[in-house]
Amino acid sequence: MTQLVLASASPARLAVLRAAGVSPLVRVSGVDEDKIADNLGPDAAPEKVVTVLAEAKAAEIVPGLAADNLTDVVVVGCDSMLLIDGQLQGKPGSVDIARKRWAAMAGRSATLLTGHCVLRVADGRIVRMASDHSATVVHFAQPSTEDLEAYLATGEPLQVAGAFTLDSLGGWFVERIEGDPSSVIGIGLPLVRTLLERVGVSVSDLWRTQSIF
């Protein structure tokens, strides 16, 4: 049986996969995202940046899979960033930065880019690879100062790309989206299905055998 391994510490990505009938192993990648982005240079296309980061995250965990004694594995790596005013924004990391970002994006729209990489691993070796990105337009509301400060105080927007979530508290401040909602959460199911097919895996082969209803 093929085992899916999620190369991410994101609880949101894990929740999306579990809700879709998959029970992945989780192995957290330790790649230096800033270094990879810097090596690509300032002129790199935003879509390339998130895709290369997803590829690096997926590849980084492969050597450690040998200890799991798995013979047939697909590794999924993802990276999300918000593209606004021509600039890519990852996790703000601080309240001040998150506040400034919300001041710039409130009442406007931006594009959430998510790079995806799927690796087929057999006997510890990468035998097939497929990668691509998704792009979803997010239309933001204009939260009141009180609501925004309360949101910032929760700490949620500090640790997510673009300083917002769709599936949690941040969803109150998203007017609508154009595109795949799961990709905004961090892992696009339609795109992952396509990439799995490219490496020779049917998504139904990854579903849990027991009923999920």
From Swiss-Prot:
Q: Which Pfam families does the UniProt record give?
A: Maf (PF02545)
Which GO biological process annotations does it have? nucleotide metabolic process
**Where this protein primarily resides, as one coarse class?**
cytoplasm
Q: Which SUPFAM superfamilies match?
A: ITPase-like
> What EC number(s) has UniProt assigned to this enzyme?
3.6.1.9
In its UniProt record, a GO molecular function of this protein is: nucleoside triphosphate diphosphatase activity
Family membership noted in the UniProt record: Belongs to the Maf family.
| Primary role | Nucleoside triphosphate pyrophosphatase. May have a dual role in cell division arrest and in preventing the incorporation of modified nucleotides into cellular nucleic acids.
- Protein name as annotated: Nucleoside triphosphate pyrophosphatase
